[in-house]
C-alpha cells in the first residue's frame, strides 16, 4: 500500500518536461465548459433614497426592463425587497438578484436605517454557513444569495456626503463590496461634479470607509482598473428611452437645453461603471465576497462557537483537536448540569417527602380527632339507649302491675256478685 509523505513547505519543486502530449492542457476548457453548464449568479444591492433612480439604472445596465413597483416616501421603516431573474447572453446564463432598499432615507429619525440592510446581508451569510456546516452539503445546487456588489447611490447635492451616507457605508464596508456612484449626475455642472467627487472620496477616507478596490495585481485588468479607479465615485445617468442623435438611436435623456447620452463618456460615467461592474470585475466581486467578507463572518461565527485556529499560546490547532477540546468542554458542562439536576431532584424529593409527612401527620391528627368524637358520640348514644331501656323496663313493670291489679279487681268483683246472687237464691233466706 502506498503511503503519502508530506513534503516540507520550503522544498523546491523540480520542473520536468514531458516527452509527449498528456492532455491536462485542456483543464481551462474543462473549467469553462463546467462553468458555462452550471451558469453564474450575481447579486446586487442598491442602496439609495427613494426616487434617486435605482431601478432605472438597473434597467439601463442590463439592457432590459425589470419589474419594479413605484415607491412612496411614506414607508414607516426600511425594508429590503429582492427579486431574481434568469438572463442569458450568447450561451452564458446568469441568475441575477437585485435587492432594493425600499424606504431608505424617508424617515425623520434615520439613526437605525442601516440596520435592516446589515441584518439582510448577515442573513444571507448565515444561510450559506448553515449549508456549509451540513453533513450532507449541496453547494452545487445551492442558490447563493450573498451580496456581491453594493451600489451606493449618492444624492447629487454638490456639497458633501450626508451623515446617513457616512454611517451606512461605515457599517457596510466590512460586509460587502461598496461601489459609490453619484446618481442623476446630469443635474450637476461639470466643474462642480469634479469638486463633488473629490469631496466624497476625501470624506470616505477621513471617516475610514473602505470601498471596493478594483484589482490591479492581474496584468490583464491592471491597466484598465488603475485608469478607472481615479473616476470614483462614478457619476451616472440612467435611461431606457432612445433618442435619435444624428442618424442613429441612442439611450439618452432629452432636455430643453440639449441631450444627455447615457453611453457617451463625455456626458457621464455610465460606461465606466458597466465596464468595472460587469465586463471586467464581476468574477472578482464574487471572489472577494467569498474570500473576504464571508470568511470574516464565518470566522467570527466559528469563534463565537468556540472554534479557533490557535490555542492560548498561539500554537496551531487542528480541527480534530478543536473538536476534542469542545467535546470535552461540552461533556464537562453536561456532567455539571447533570449533577446540578440530580441535586435539585434530590432536594425536590426531600421537600416533597417533608410535605407528604406533614400532610400525613395532619391526616392522622384529623383521624384521631374524628375517632375520639365518634367514640364520645357512641358513648352518648349507648348511655341514652340504656336510659331508654330502663325506662321501657320500668314502664313494662308498671304496666304489668296495673294489669295484675285490674285482673285481681275484676276477679274479686265477680266473686262478690256471685255471693250476692247465691244469697238471693238461698232457701234459708226465703223462710225468714
Curated annotation (Swiss-Prot):
One GO term of the cellular component aspect?
A: septin complex
Chain intervals for the UniProt region annotation (G1 motif): 48-55
| BP GO terms, sorted | cell division
Q: Where in the cell is it found?
A: Cytoplasm, Cytoskeleton; Synapse; Cell projection, Dendritic spine; Cell projection, Axon
Annotated region (G3 motif) at: 100-103
Q: Where is the composition biased (Low complexity)?
A: 403-416
Query: Where does the record place a coiled coil?
Result: 320-413
G4 motif: annotated segments:
183-186
Indicate which residues the UniProt annotation says bind GTP.
Answer: 48-55, 103, 184-192, 238, 253
**PANTHER family with a match to the protein in the record:** SEPTIN (PTHR18884)
Q: Which domain of life is it from?
A: Eukaryota
Domain Septin-type G, chain residue ranges per copy: 38-304
Q: What is this protein called?
A: Septin-11
Phosphoserine carried by residues = 9
Q: Which residues carry this modification: N-acetylalanine?
A: 2
Q: How does it assemble?
A: Septins polymerize into heterooligomeric protein complexes that form filaments, and can associate with cellular membranes, actin filaments and microtubules. Forms homooligomers. GTPase activity is required for filament formation. Interacts with SEPTIN7, SEPTIN9 and SEPTIN12.
Residues covered by region (Disordered): 403-432
**From what organism does this protein derive?**
Macaca fascicularis
Amino acid at each position: 500500500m502506498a503511503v503519502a509523505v508530506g513534503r516540507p513547505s520550503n522544498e523546491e519543486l523540480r520542473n520536468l518536461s514531458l516527452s509527449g502530449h498528456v492532455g491536462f492542457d485542456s483543464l481551462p476548457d474543462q473549467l469553462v465548459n463546467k462553468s458555462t453548464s452550471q451558469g453564474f449568479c450575481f447579486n446586487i444591492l442598491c442602496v439609495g433614497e427613494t426616487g434617486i433612480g435605482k431601478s432605472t439604472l438597473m434597467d439601463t445596465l442590463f439592457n432590459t426592463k425589470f419589474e419594479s413597483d413605484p415607491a412612496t416616501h411614506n414607508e414607516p421603516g426600511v425594508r429590503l425587497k429582492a427579486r431574481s431573474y434568469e438572463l442569458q447572453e450568447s450561451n452564458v446564463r446568469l441568475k441575477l438578484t437585485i435587492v432594493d432598499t425600499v424606504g431608505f432615507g424617508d424617515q425623520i429619525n434615520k439613526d437605525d436605517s442601516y440596520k435592516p440592510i446589515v441584518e439582510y446581508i448577515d442573513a444571507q451569510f448565515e444561510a450559506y454557513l448553515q449549508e456549509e456546516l451540513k453533513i450532507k452539503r449541496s453547494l452545487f445546487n445551492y442558490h447563493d444569495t450573498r451580496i456581491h456588489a453594493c451600489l451606493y447611490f449618492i444624492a447629487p447635492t454638490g456639497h458633501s456626503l450626508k451623515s446617513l451616507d457616512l454611517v451606512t457605508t461605515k457599517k457596510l464596508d466590512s460586509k460587502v463590496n461598496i461601489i459609490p456612484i453619484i446618481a442623476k449626475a446630469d443635474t450637476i455642472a461639470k466643474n462642480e461634479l469634479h469638486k463633488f467627487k473629490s469631496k466624497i472620496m476625501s470624506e470616505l477616507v477621513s471617516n475610514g470607509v473602505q470601498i471596493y478596490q478594483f484589482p490591479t495585481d492581474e496584468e490583464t485588468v491592471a491597466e484598465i482598473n488603475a485608469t478607472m479607479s481615479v473616476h470614483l465615485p462614478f457619476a451616472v445617468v440612467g435611461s431606457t428611452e432612445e433618442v435619435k442623435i444624428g442618424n442613429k438611436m441612442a439611450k439618452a435623456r432629452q432636455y430643453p437645453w440639449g441631450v444627455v447620452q447615457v453611453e457617451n463618456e463625455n456626458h457621464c460615467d455610465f460606461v465606466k461603471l458597466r465596464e468595472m461592474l460587469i465586463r471586467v470585475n464581476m468574477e472578482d466581486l464574487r471572489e472577494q465576497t467569498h474570500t473576504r467578507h464571508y470568511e470574516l463572518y464565518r470566522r467570527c461565527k466559528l469563534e463565537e462557537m468556540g472554534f479557533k485556529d490557535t490555542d492560548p499560546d498561539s500554537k496551531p490547532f487542528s480541527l480534530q483537536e478543536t473538536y476534542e477540546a469542545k467535546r470535552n468542554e461540552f461533556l464537562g458542562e453536561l456532567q455539571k448540569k447533570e449533577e446540578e439536576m440530580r441535586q435539585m431532584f434530590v432536594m425536590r424529593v426531600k421537600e416533597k417527602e417533608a410535605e407528604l409527612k406533614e400532610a400525613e401527620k395532619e391526616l392522622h391528627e384529623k383521624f384521631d380527632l374524628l375517632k375520639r368524637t365518634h367514640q364520645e358520640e357512641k358513648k352518648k348514644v349507648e348511655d341514652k339507649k340504656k336510659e331508654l331501656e330502663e325506662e321501657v323496663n320500668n314502664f313494662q313493670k308498671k304496666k304489668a302491675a296495673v294489669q295484675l291489679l285490674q285482673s285481681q279487681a275484676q276477679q274479686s268483683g265477680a266473686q262478690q256478685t256471685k255471693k250476692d246472687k247465691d244469697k238471693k237464691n238461698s232457701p234459708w233466706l226465703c223462710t225468714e
